[in-house]
Design a protein with these regions (language model features):
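Short, contiguous alpha-helical
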Residues: 55-106, 146-192
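A non-catalytic, amphipathic alpha-helix used as a structural packing/dimerization or gating element
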Residues: 34-41, 122-136, 173
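Short, helix-capping/interhelical loops that line the mouth of catalytic, cofactor-
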Residues: 13-30, 78-129, 189-192
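Alpha-helical bundle segments that constitute or directly flank the non-heme di-iron/ferroxidase center
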Residues: 24-53, 74-84, 169, 173-176
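Proline-centered turn/helix-capping motifs that create local helix->coil transitions or kinks
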Residues: 139-147
Length: 192
């Protein structure tokens, strides 16, 4: 998952840029704790959003609550799929088969179609489940696999990031960033 850059399908994904300010982790346990913390804080923001409002768009280019969750489900699902496919000896297509990193509008629309009909509760439960799968997977990785580049073919793109960075940008970073987006949505839509 990339840090959301909007719907411009020609945007360069955030993972293609060097980011010296990206959080780092001492070990897998620290990354797992960060995932749980960021996810809990993100999902807490949905507690007072009514199911009837999940498709309400606050601003023309903004995301609805359902789209925010679909985006998260899509990218965490892709991360898990990349690993599953590689471990099964299959060719992994990143970001997704038929798409390139400079054209992410298609996958986003697929995420919205695939997950947009879920209730907010169902989407949150599914996201918790996928995050738990990611954490379980992280516990199986050696320090070398997690922190050194070139440990997976799916991670060997132009960025040459180690797995931990891919996990961070598909979990902690968007959970944190989109929490702010949901708060802004609520300020514009929820009234006392």
């Amino acid at each position: 998952m990339m840090v959301w850059l909007g719907d411009n399908p020609n945007c360069m994904p955030a993972n293609q840029h060097k980011d010296s300010s990206m959080k780092t982790y001492a070990n897998a346990a620290e990354l797992i704790t960060a995932i749980h913390t960021a996810l809990d804080q993100y999902l807490t923001e949905f507690a007072d959003i009514a199911e009837a409002d999940k498709h309400h768009r606050a601003v023309p280019d903004g995301k609805t609550p359902a789209e925010h969750l679909a985006y998260q489900l899509g990218w965490t699902g892709l991360l898990l799929q990349w690993e599953r496919d590689e471990q099964a000896g299959q060719t992994v297509h990143t970001p997704a088969e038929g798409y390139k990193w400079n054209n992410l509008g298609g996958p986003y629309q697929q995420f919205y179609r695939q997950y947009g009909s879920l209730s907010l509760q169902e989407a949150q439960a599914r996201l918790r489940g996928q995050a738990a799968q990611i954490c379980t997977w992280l516990e199986t990785l050696s320090e070398q696999e997690l922190f050194e580049p070139n440990q997976r073919r799916w991670a060997n793109n132009q960025a040459k990031w180690p797995i931990w960075k891919w996990v961070h940008i598909n979990t902690v970073a968007p959970f944190t960033n989109f929490r702010v987006h949901i708060r802004k949505w609520k300020k514009q839509n929820l009234h006392d």
